[in-house]
């Protein structure tokens, strides 16, 4: 006998798989907007309420991002949740900050060099724009955390490496912790090193980008070490 309740529960899952197939078949990229609800429901031959349930499921898996009043977009790092390594549940935040910094030293200078090598004009424009936005927020003593995260994410995407964007949560998880730990005392250093990183990537100078990112992280380490003594 058919289990109608089970089929009903599985429907959003089945539709979500169809949406993923649609994204892949249409070659939609991270940040691209999906068709509107009416168009997509017609395309997939499903009801709009079922489509909404499937979209909520995909949003919970960080495959799409739903922006109220704007639409639904392919997530920046599809399928990568915000805290895949469970940093939230690590109680020793001082140790966490130090260890995240070590990992960032291993990853980010090389990522910046790759971005300088492979970033296209759109990537460069995004990185420069975000650099400016972070700078303006810092100058006006406003919270720059989210734009800082977007800046480092844009650099990772500029590498054109399929794996690196999936490492972004490691970087993103550390930035709010670093901002909290340093207390924004590194305003000048952040502005200067962000500019150097962005300009090096715009110039496609891999060595300069790598050195600038290393210096950026070095300032953070020095400040964090002095505050944790």
Segments the model singles out, each with a brief description of its role:
Residues 1-106, 113:
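Short linear motifs at protein or domain termini
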Residues 1-2, 207-229:
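C-terminal effector-binding regulatory domain of bacterial HTH transcription factors
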Residues 20-25, 156, 198, 214:
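Solvent-exposed, non-membrane alpha-helical residues enriched in polar/charged side chains
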Residues 82-85, 175, 179-183, 221-228:
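Short amphipathic alpha-helical interaction/hinge segments
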Residues 100-178, 192-194, 208-219:
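Conserved amphipathic alpha-helical segments that form helical-bundle/coiled-coil interaction surfaces
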Residues 185-189:
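Short helix-capping and inter-helix turn/linker motifs at the boundaries of alpha-helical repeat units
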């Amino acid at each position: 006998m058919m289990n109608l309740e089970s089929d009903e529960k599985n429907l959003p899952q089945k539709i979500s798989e169809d949406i993923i197939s649609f994204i892949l078949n249409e070659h939609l990229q991270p940040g691209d907007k999906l068709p509107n609800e009416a168009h997509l429901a017609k395309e997939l031959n499903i009801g709009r309420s079922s489509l909404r349930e499937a979209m909520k499921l995909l949003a919970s898996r960080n495959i799409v991002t739903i922006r109220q009043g704007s639409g639904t977009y392919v997530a920046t790092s599809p399928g990568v949740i915000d805290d895949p390594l469970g940093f939230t549940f690590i109680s020793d935040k001082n140790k966490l900050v130090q260890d995240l910094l070590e990992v960032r030293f291993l990853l980010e200078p090389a990522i910046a060099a790759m971005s300088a090598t492979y970033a296209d004009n759109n990537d460069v424009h995004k990185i420069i724009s975000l650099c400016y936005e972070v700078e303006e927020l810092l100058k006006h003593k406003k919270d720059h955390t989210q734009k800082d995260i977007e800046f480092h994410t844009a650099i990772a995407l500029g590498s054109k490496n399929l794996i690196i964007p999936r490492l972004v949560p490691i970087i993103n998880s550390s930035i709010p912790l670093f901002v909290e730990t340093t207390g924004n005392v590194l305003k000048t250093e952040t502005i200067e090193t962000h500019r150097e990183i962005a300009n090096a990537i715009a110039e496609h100078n891999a060595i300069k980008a790598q050195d600038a990112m290393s210096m950026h992280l070095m300032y953070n380490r020095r400040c964090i070490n002095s505050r944790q003594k």
